[in-house]
Amino acid sequence: MIDYAAAGEWLEAYGRAWQTFDGDAWVGLFTEDAEYHEDPFGTPLVGHNALRAYLLEAAASETDVEFTVERHWTAGDTLLAAWHAGFARKPGGQHARLAGFLTAEIASDGRASRFREWTLQAPGTEG
């Protein structure tokens, strides 16, 4: 079971790892065999190697990342959050604005074993 404070700390660490593109911090948030569903209909990324590659891909195409949690909740072992993000695209600097919702199933060691997100892009922004 994850409590509200621990969920907030996990989300802060998630945002910080994305903003700094810290691969070790990023994969440290997930179990070794974690599933990361960027799209509810797509094939998930599975495991630390896939997660690190995903972050490296983001680092190659994004800069000036901002990540803000609007609100979060917990239900048993599940963390739920509404969030907003923005970043500039490399090259060119086109700005992207996103809003989303995520769920993370948190294992007993505090790492996510399954992560799902649903994302909307603001009209008129590059994504």
Q: Where in the sequence are the language-model features?
A:
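A beta-strand edge to alpha-helix "cap/lid" segment located at domain peripheries
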Residues: 1, 6, 52-127
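Short, low-complexity N-terminal intrinsically disordered segments enriched in polar/charged residues
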Residues: 1-32, 126-127
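Hydrophobic pocket/interface hotspot
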Residues: 14, 26-27, 34, 47, ...
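Structured beta->alpha junctions
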Residues: 15, 40, 71-73
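Secondary-structure boundary/capping signal
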Residues: 22, 34, 63-66
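Short hydrophobic/aromatic segments of transmembrane alpha-helices and their interfaces
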Residues: 33-34, 95
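A short gly/proline-enriched turn/hairpin at secondary-structure junctions
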Residues: 35-45, 60
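Generic, well-ordered alpha-helical segments
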Residues: 43-46, 50, 64
